[in-house]
Amino acid sequence: MKHAGFTRAVIEAYQMRADGHTPPDNTVDKDTNPKDAIGSKKLPLHLVPSSGIAMTATAFLEGALKYGKYNWRIAGVRASIYLDAMHRHIAKWENGEDVDPETGVSHLASVCACAMIIMDARLCGKLTDDRPPRASVADLINLLADDVQRLQVRFKDHHPHQYTIHDGELT
């Protein structure tokens, strides 16, 4: 179904936004410039850091050179493939590998590219959503917050060293 040039996926994506949650309007309208009143109500793309866009572009370049640019818009993608890739890139970054040793592309940029491909494929109606059946994980996370507080109280007098990447290699 199409409506005003949008696919059902676009309409559903907009409907999925949380009701009543709008970004704060920290803009100021100036009477002297009529464009301010209109422009300040548009999507604030300037909020996306240019550094992130630039680094993510390297991940998209890698993909374009390997598979062809925008290939997912034609061939389609399965969500699980990109979710797996995001998990692998995050695990590598979390464990100290900032960039892929073969390509030099930032793992975090690859995570961003994967997420953007999923969103774009969904927008274009080319996403096969093969995520597992829904589970109440959000409710579980909220419920476990009580356990976090209980554990923090239980161990409040313990002050072990909290190791980070700056502590060196394990032996």
Predicted region positions:
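Intrinsically disordered, low-complexity regulatory regions
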Residues: H3-T171
